[in-house]
Amino acid sequence: RFELMGNPGPAEGVVNGISDALKAVRQQYKNGADLIKITATGGVLSVAKSGENPQFKEEEIQAIVETAADYDMHVAAHAHGAEGMKRAVRAGVRSIEHGTLMDKETMGLMKKYGTYYVPTISAGEFVAEKAKVDGYYPEIIRPKAAKIGPQIKNTFQRAYKAGVKIAFGTDSGVSYHGENGKEFLHMVEWGMTPMEAILSATK
C-alpha cells in the first residue's frame, strides 16, 4: 500500500507489549534522544481511515514514561482521539500534541495531572487547506484532513477557557519550516492575550 511518510518497523520503535516499550525507549536514548514522543493515537496523515484510534495500552505508555524518567527524559504524546489522550495523561506523559478531539473529561485529567497541551493550530489549518487541493493527499487521507484539521481551533479555545496548561508548538514537517511564528497569531486570534502566547513559548 502507499506509505505517505513511511512507517517504522520494530527496530524503529513499534512496540508490542511492555518489554518492547522498554527496549524502544532505551534504544532512543542510546541514539541520542533527550525526549521521547509517542503516537498515542493514529494521525490525520496516517494512511488509515481513522486517526482517532488508541495505539497503546495504558500500561505500555506507563512503562515508556517510567523508563524515560530513568534517563531524565519527558514523554510527549501525539494524539487526536480522546481515549488515547486519556490513557496517555493517566500514564504520565508531559504533553499532548494536537489534541484535536479532546473532550471535557480529558481536559479535567490534564488539569489534574498538570499535562501541557500543544495545540499546533498551524498544522490544522495547513492540512485543512491542502485537503481542498485535488491530488495533494491520497483519497483515504483527504476526508480526515478536511474534517479534523479545522477542529483544532475550537479545541484550543475550549482548553484555554478550561484552564489547561498550554505550550507553544507547531508540527515539524506539516506546516512550513520558518513560519512557526504564525502560531502566535492563531493563539491570539482564538483567545490568548499576546503576552500569554509569548509566555507559552518562553516560560
Regions found by a protein language model. Give the residues of each.
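Structural recognition of alpha->loop->beta junctions
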Residues: 86-106, 183-198
